[in-house]
């Protein structure tokens, strides 16, 4: 979950950056992508090693998990994280955490699911 939040924050920063700052952030995005690729490949290697001899396809499992990004359990986890980190995340609006974390998490998870789908589509 922490990796997903860091990835989402990085992507949002690049999206809203001024044009002259996008070059700098572009380097950060490249590093995030490289890190993601390394994590993904290591996870695949570990998964394949553990499931050797079983009829389980890593990519199918990943696709099924992507569909779960924007689900009830992840919404609950996001809201809990938002409320716990309200001062950092919401700043002056921290007292409104119980009211705004739900909609914010709904949007963040929808965006994260779209990003995951887009990355997954690029790999096909």
UniProtKB/Swiss-Prot annotation:
What are the record keywords, sorted? Disulfide bond, Neurotoxin, Secreted, Signal, Toxin
Subcellular location, principal: secreted
Give Gene Ontology CC terms.
extracellular region
Keyword Plastid on entry: no
| Distribution of this protein across tissues and organs | Expressed by the venom duct.
Task: Fill in the PTM field for this protein.
Answer: Contains 2 disulfide bond.
Propeptide ranges, please? 18-74
A single MF term (Gene Ontology): toxin activity
Which cell locations does it reside in?
Secreted
Signal peptide region:
1-17
- Annotated domain remarks: The cysteine framework is XIV (C-C-C-C).
Q: What is this protein's name? A: Conotoxin Cl14.12
Supply the source organism's classification: Eukaryota, Metazoa, Spiralia, Lophotrochozoa, Mollusca
């Amino acid at each position: 979950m922490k990796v997903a939040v860091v990835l989402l924050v990085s992507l949002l920063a690049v999206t809203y950056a001024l044009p002259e700052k996008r070059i700098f952030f572009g380097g950060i995005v490249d590093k995030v992508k490289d890190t993601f690729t390394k994590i993904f490949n290591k996870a695949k290697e570990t998964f394949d090693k553990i499931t050797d001899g079983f009829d389980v396809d890593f990519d199918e499992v990943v696709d099924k998990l992507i569909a779960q990004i924007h689900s009830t359990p992840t919404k609950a986890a996001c809201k809990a994280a938002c409320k716990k980190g309200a001062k950092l995340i919401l700043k002056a609006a921290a007292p409104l955490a119980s009211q705004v974390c739900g909609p914010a998490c709904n949007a963040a998870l929808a965006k994260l699911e779209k990003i995951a789908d887009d990355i997954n589509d690029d790999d096909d």
